[in-house]
Amino acid sequence: YGNIRMNNFFGVKDIFIDNDIIYLSSSYYEIEKDCHGLALYKSSIENNEKLYINEWDEIFKSEKCLKEEIHTKKRMPLASSGGRIVKLDENNLLLSVGDYAVDGYYAKEKFSQDLSNDYGKILQIDLLTKQHEIFSYGHRNVQGLYAENKKNIFATEHGPHGGDELNKIYREKNYGWPLATFGTGYFD
């Protein structure tokens, strides 16, 4: 992985290749702070008989690094992390960032409904400036993301037990998690 450190079994989430550029989303872990989140990297590809990937450039990192103590109930580390990548247009990608089970059940907070953080969102990332903005929110764990053009964007989402979803995605729309779901808690 070059200069990307994988310290957990939830490492790489997705890759997206655009001509000679490869994008990779991955969970990250900061040892000195003992916290984790999601990051997006890019690199150029050189194809000389063997695929070689140069050093990675970080273009996004979730702004709030999460400590495990945020959870009030036992859960799988880094569950519901998202990480799907799709190209929106020439200069923008969409990236799903899961709620990391900070959903009002496993933790007191409900990140998906809080517009002051990156979690539980689909983000639009400007590849020229590395700036990002919320495209849609109220997501739990988007695991499939497709964009035919700016008007036809679809996402599949892992819901809680019995609550998986297929949604057409619209800019600035709230998809309801965890306030609205057909699923139930795994331990209810």
Each model region followed by its residue ranges:
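Beta-propeller domain segments
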Residues: G2-V12, G98-D188
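Acidic, Gly/Ser/Thr-rich repeat motifs that build Ca2+-stabilized beta-propeller blades
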Residues: Y1-G104, G144-A147, K151-G159
